[in-house]
């Protein structure tokens, strides 16, 4: 059925009046307040009981991550800005306008905080970001989003992508990363503690993830900036001592150290020693390097009818 031009809504922002929704059989049903665009922000994807896509605001958790000129978040945001501006060149050569970044490293080094900070920058530029929890629900939501907003730049986030693949398999993700759904103007951001658990089809094929970036424990400049922000009024010499003692501690341990010493009154050196012993005892990704290939003997979860978990039938 061809859309009726008289039903189109001009302008932008909210429509404060109820409107008529056109049903497939030509019938009409009232619908509530509408918008021509999603507000700039981060969203998770879901489905209602009828399988219709929904977008729920997603809180961002980047408050503690310190940014400064030349930092990784600022470099990635610069790359993304250059990528958005290059759309015409992609089209002239005949490529989908897509880009992918995979962040990897041991747990606690700040991958999620880094991604959330990048997303904050994307949102500040007026764009939208979508977090993928269930690949099949996510794919349906992205296709629905493009029906409403066909040209808007978007960022898609896949945190702990290895866990997503283990639970749901990689078929839907590979379709998305390959652009099989022809959803254009996309930047994909993913993270993993265990890159070796991911099939080489994901990590070793260009155009799925074009940049693989290792995230290590924060360096001295980052630690100094973080401690200066958290420990207001601390003498420079004392902060330098903290910076020296915390060499090699991951981001999460650095936050715990501030709580342990500044909030709970524990001894600095004893707290550092305890946190370093805990970090040394944490599972390393190297322990899994000789394990079975991803999904071997570990089938993705499914509903009783065989459809993937999270897929509304």
Regions found by a protein language model. Name each.
Residues 2-41, 205-206, 212-313:
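C-terminal alpha-helical "lid" subdomain
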Residues 1-87, 97-98, 103-108, 114, ...:
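AAA+ P-loop ATPase mechanoenzymes
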Residues 67-240:
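Walker A/P-loop NTP-binding motif of AAA+ ATPase domains
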């Amino acid at each position: 059925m061809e859309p009726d031009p008289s039903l189109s809504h001009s302008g932008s922002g909210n429509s404060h009046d109820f409107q008529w929704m056109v049903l497939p059989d030509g019938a009409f049903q009232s619908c509530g307040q509408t918008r021509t665009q999603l507000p700039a922000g981060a969203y998770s994807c879901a489905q209602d009981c009828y399988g219709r896509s929904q977008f729920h605001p997603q809180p961002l958790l980047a408050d503690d991550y310190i940014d400064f000129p030349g930092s990784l978040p600022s470099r990635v945001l610069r790359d993304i800005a250059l990528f958005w501006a290059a759309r015409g060149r992609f089209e002239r050569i005949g490529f989908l306008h897509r880009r992918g970044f995979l962040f990897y490293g041991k747990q606690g080094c700040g991958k999620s905080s880094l991604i959330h900070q990048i997303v904050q920058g994307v949102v500040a530029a007026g764009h939208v970001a979508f977090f993928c929890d269930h690949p099949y629900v996510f794919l349906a939501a992205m296709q629905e989003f493009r029906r409403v907003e066909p040209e808007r730049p978007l960022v898609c986030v896949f945190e702990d992508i290895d866990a997503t693949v283990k639970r749901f398999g990689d078929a839907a993700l590979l379709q998305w990363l390959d652009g099989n759904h022809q959803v254009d103007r996309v930047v994909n951001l993913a993270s993993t503690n265990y890159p070796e658990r991911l099939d080489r089809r994901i990590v070793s094929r260009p155009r799925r993830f074009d940049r693989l970036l290792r995230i290590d424990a924060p360096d001295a400049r980052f630690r100094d900036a973080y401690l200066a922000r958290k420990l207001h009024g601390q003498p420079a010499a004392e902060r330098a001592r903290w910076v020296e003692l915390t060499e090699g501690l991951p981001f999460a341990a650095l936050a715990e150290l501030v709580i342990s010493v500044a909030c709970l009154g524990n001894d600095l050196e004893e707290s550092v020693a305890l946190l370093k012993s805990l970090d040394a005892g944490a599972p390393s990704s190297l322990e899994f390097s000789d394990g079975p290939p991803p999904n071997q003997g570990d089938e993705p979860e499914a509903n009783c009818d065989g459809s993937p978990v999270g897929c509304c039938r």
